[in-house]
A protein has these predicted regions:
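Active-/binding-site microenvironments in catalytic and ligand-binding cores
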Residues: 1-218
């Protein structure tokens, strides 16, 4: 049986809003088909474009330096935390906004990508997506960090309550060296376990956050 892939990333396009107040992506055509066709004397043609985007665009990974000065940057993230990581998916759709440690009670998440399903991604690219987001509590993040999770992902605007300026989830998880993947989608298509997550950003030295093509291989 051929492998099955589940797409977990939102497509990126010019002008889309990921997080209210941050710059939207801009696309510039550098070489178009007509220009290149002339350059190659009608024998071939190409499209070359540039994408100017904030690191917090679409579905992206946070590295520790995003929250902590002197923390590990994107280039320093170990690939074993980002590629072919066994998944452990938790259904938090009945929790309301605050997702506490009881969701993870008794679960073995050591060395796993903890993926929290809220179904908030159904509001993607609507005004509703920019407020009242589901989030992980500080106690929940303490549990995950202590249990040895390798990555934590969520299909929400933010893993923190955007009204909490302390940002405990980012503080705890990134402080423990655990990458965060936000703005995921299609989590309802995932089994509770048995798949492997791939969510690898570019090795940007000094980079804090960057979009990823996140997917699970079943």
């Amino acid at each position: 049986m051929p492998p099955r892939f589940i797409e977990l990333s939102h497509p990126i396009e010019a002008g889309m809003v990921t997080y209210p107040g941050l710059p939207v992506p801009e696309v510039k055509i550098i070489v178009d088909y007509d220009t290149s066709n002339e350059r190659y004397k009608g024998k071939s043609e190409f499209l070359i474009a540039s994408l100017h985007a904030c690191g917090n665009t679409g579905t992206y990974v946070d590295s520790p330096i995003h929250r902590h000065r002197g923390g590990t940057d994107l280039a320093g993230l170990p690939l074993e935390r980002l590629a072919h990581v066994p998944i452990s998916v938790f259904d938090a759709t009945s929790f309301g906004r605050a997702i506490g440690p009881e969701l993870f009670k008794g679960a073995d998440v050591r060395g796993k990508a903890v993926i929290v399903r809220t179904d908030f991604s159904k509001h993607w690219r609507t005004e509703a997506y920019g407020k009242d987001n589901p989030f992980l509590t500080a106690d929940a993040c303490d549990v995950l960090a202590g249990a040895g999770a390798w990555l934590v992902g969520i299909d929400s605007l933010n893993i923190d309550d955007i009204g909490d300026l302390v940002r405990p989830a980012h503080t705890i998880l990134l402080g423990a060296g655990i990458p965060i993947c936000e703005h995921m989608t299609n989590l309802s298509q995932l089994p509770a376990s048995g798949g492997h997550l791939h969510a690898v950003p570019i090795p940007w030295k000094g980079g804090a956050t960057f979009p990823v093509r996140a997917y699970v291989l079943l």
